[in-house]
Amino acid sequence: MVQQQGMERINVGIFAHVDAGKTTTTEHILYESGRIKAVGSVDSGTALTDSMEVERQRGISVRAALASFEWRGVLVNLVDTPGHVDFLSEVERSLRVMDCAVLILSAVEGVQAQSEMIWNALRKLGIPTLIFLNKMDRTGADPAAVLAQARTYLSGDILPVQQALGQERNYAGAVDLWAEAADPAARTELLESLAERDEALLETYMSGAPLDLTAWKNQLKAGAAAGKWFPLVYGVAAKGLGITQLLDAMTDYFPRACGSLELPVSGIVYNIQRDKSMGRMAFVRLYQGTIRNRDTVMNYTQDVQGKVTQIRKVEGGRTEDVGALEAGDIAVVYGLSGVRIGDVLGVPDAIPQEAKLAVPLLTVRVHWDAAVDEHEVIGAFQELADEDPLLDTQWLQDERELHIKVMGPIQLEILDSVLESRYGLKVTFGQPSVIYRETPSRTGEGYVAYLMPKPCWAILRFRIEPGPPGSGLVYESLVRSSDLLPQYQNETARRVPEALMQGLYGWEVTDLKVTLTEGQHHVWHTHPLDFAVATPMAIMDGLNRVGTKLLEPILQVRIVVPEENGGRVMNDLVQMRGTFEPPVLQGERMIIEGRLPLATSLDYPVSLSSYTKGRSTFTSFFAGYEECPPDVRAERTRRGVNPLDQARYILSVRKALQG
């Protein structure tokens, strides 16, 4: 592996929509850099970054994979992320630890819905981004059309820094516009684009004086490193065309990772995996400080200390002890038992914000034969939930049922394979159900006086108000500490989110503000757990008074079909309660963008592919929750005793708290 300490570093994420050639590009990058001796293949299951057995079998990336190499004296930590929307949680976690990104677009399919979603997240986080326009040799490749599309849907500041030599079968590579061999007219177009975006460059350009191309390129480098401008390069990853130029562009236009080695440790755990012999592997991006083997590190999130046993670089199935992790670098830390994804190590000072992309929209029950040990199944899913917390594994003790949350059907297929290959367990999954939510219909109050059966005393009054869409839960207390002691207020605040997990229809209640307006305790009779019992009763009393509305998940979709199928697609969208923009014709293809309820469109991609004979693409991403029409009813069986039945609820909760 490459020498690391003291080197300049860049941490790069590779992102793409499904089938844009992302893993193939990564393999050729690793080969061109000398990191591997032969190019692996997605189809043959030999790609270095597809190290899981299921990835090799299925030919798709399931988990974000880390690889390191050196190029032009710079250490590059490259994270290859999954392209399929079902594994968006891996993309989300990778975004948080990247300093820069390569977004791969296909010169045939162009910008897809997932491309837009990833782009928006990159912009929200201010991550400098380079675009690699792949598959330039494919029939139907149209780089000019895709560039126009990218400038419309992504950014008007996408700037090609190469001139493509031909397209489709005639594609013969690309020439750097800064090189002497570049076509003067193409270079002038780049210079004019830069001048339009920078007043100082415009003055220089208009002066008529000879242009210093090195200075202009340095300005482009600065703008790209600042995330203002986005260089674009061309290539054919499957043939290795354009890979060297892509690597050069990465080291030219991307900023170096920074962070003081002397400041206190500040890092984040962005991935958890397991090693059969060494246990839990915590993938850590360190922003400042240094961690060494045998150091004791504070887990800020959990307020516990852990002893580091080893720090290793892991690539595919190969690992090497590197002894230390420095600011700006990424490595795997062993020895931190109980560490979880998202945990902050050291101090939180240098940790960047995160972008929320992945929202599980389906819930599924897990089934197994009577001969299978249920404890093994539950344990396996709990381990898998450590690696992907969005699975949200729930074991319902009374019902003897196991439920998980997933993004889509492909994820279920992968889970099935992983359970069999890693744990030797065979399970089946029930029919996926859409996860609805609830929100208050109007403003009102909830009240409880929990005074019997003694000993107990807790009085609470909440104001419940509808909030803006997507606002989640906002909680506030107006009660003075002299009326309700801080420890009781803290217990109440902690229990409010739990109380909202099941509303009047059994779904999580969201997009609301809850304000504690009154609270009382008794000097002798009150126990802190009294407020754990009282809070759900007051919340449910309030929801029962104000009523709740059902919310359903909505998808933003982009459908590309042959022109003759466009009319049927638009009719389908109407039948599914969807809306759409005026369709766009692109050659013989029709592009239709719109919004669809997930509940009505679960099976539509299969149906669409069938009647277009495989000549369609359907891409989507989660757009948010919206109010259901009045005729849509979706009620979920409540788990546990309803707090509205206060007598039974008090008895059941008291028994649970004491037991």
Cite the ranges covered by each PLM segment.
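Structural and coupling elements of P-loop NTPases
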Residues: M1-G659
